[in-house]
C-alpha cells in the first residue's frame, strides 16, 4: 500500500483494541505513509466542554500523550514521524486537531 489515512478514527477505538488497529495498519498493511488526525484534548477548554468532544469518543489525548503514542509506533514498526497541528494555534493549548505523518523508514 502507498498510504493509509486515519482521519478522526483512533479516538473511536476502545483503548484495549487500539493495539490491534496499530498492528493491522502499521504491521500488516505497512503502507509507505500513514496520516493520523485526532482531537487535541487540551483545546477542549475553548469549546467550554467538560469531558470528551463527542459522546462516541473513547478517549482524547493531550499533545504529550499523542506524541508518546506516535513515537512508540514509529519505534515499534520502523516509521519516522512528524507532528503538526491543524486549525488555529493557541500558545497554551495548541491546535484543535493533532496530525501525525508517518513515513516508513527504508533499510539501507
Predicted regions and their residues:
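S-adenosyl-L-methionine-dependent methyltransferase catalytic module, highlighting the catalytic core
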Residues: 1-6, 13-108
